[in-house]
Swiss-Prot record:
NCBIfam families found in the cross-reference section: PS_decarb
Pathways per UniProt: Phospholipid metabolism; phosphatidylethanolamine biosynthesis; phosphatidylethanolamine from CDP-diacylglycerol: step 2/2
Pfam families: PS_Dcarbxylase (PF02666)
Keyword Zinc: no
A molecular function GO annotation: phosphatidylserine decarboxylase activity
PTM summary: Is synthesized initially as an inactive proenzyme. Formation of the active enzyme involves a self-maturation process in which the active site pyruvoyl group is generated from an internal serine residue via an autocatalytic post-translational modification. Two non-identical subunits are generated from the proenzyme in this reaction, and the pyruvate is formed at the N-terminus of the alpha chain, which is derived from the carboxyl end of the proenzyme.
Native species: Shigella dysenteriae serotype 1 (strain Sd197)
Protein's UniProt name: Phosphatidylserine decarboxylase proenzyme
Amino acid sequence: MLNSFKLSLQYILPKLWLTRLAGWGASKRAGWLTKLVIDLFVKYYKVDMKEAQKPDTASYRTFNEFFVRPLRDEVRPIDTDPNVLVMPADGVISQLGKIEEDKILQAKGHNYSLEALLAGNYLMADLFRNGTFVTTYLSPRDYHRVHMPCNGILREMIYVPGDLFSVNHLTAQNVPNLFARNERVICLFDTEFGPMAQILVGATIVGSIETVWAGTITPPREGIIKRWTWPAGENDGSVALLKGQEMGRFKLGSTVINLFAPGKVNLVEQLESLSVTKIGQPLAVSTETFVTPDAEPAPLPAEEIEAEHYASPLVDDKKDQV
């Protein structure tokens, strides 16, 4: 009965307005009130502040600043084996496995379309048919920056407007085509393991989705698909990111979906639905054994995130540690 009520609310509540209100409130400096809200959040969700670079909740000027708090480097060591791809986010695996032609498993008994997830881009979908996918759910208590599973050259980014359903286990099991319906940002990379897509999926009360190379992608929510492309390799204007490097962030919890080309990687055998994930731990292994040459990432813009002009720089959070 309770679950039915929660699902009904997903269709009844004005999700867009709730999301806008949450984003507005989370960006405001409110002194002692901000600290009180953060303290209550930490207590309710059992957030481990010992992992944060700034464990004192009084050091965060807004709730958003707290929510995208950087972690200390040593708490998420990155597996250095060049044949291993690592987990991109802290959270829980919702589903994982093989993409069956155009079908991706959402929950037991529920599939959705690969092509629909990629906003009807059949050329991009062709890269991943019969490939491998991993869906990672980030709960409110989790660290909300998203990192690279491997070295990658950014080739394309697509913003897809959509619904703002919650993306927890209840909705995944009951809302058809959930991830192909919700707002999302699709990032396509060239990697040594073939093409890889990393998709940041929005949800109710997710105030914004951001990337390190472009800042805030949403809001504004203009209701139209937007597409950007970048040159390959070492060409001028290319964006290269290293394994374990931050690539984006959410303000409030959501989901990351990774797509890998067929025959390129094998998922770690121990992983299954509801497995806990930590950034830097093994996610998959290359089907070929090789040694990756050292690479340096292209410099990223030092601009600050548009949604918060006083936020830490996108590339290096250590510069203003206290």
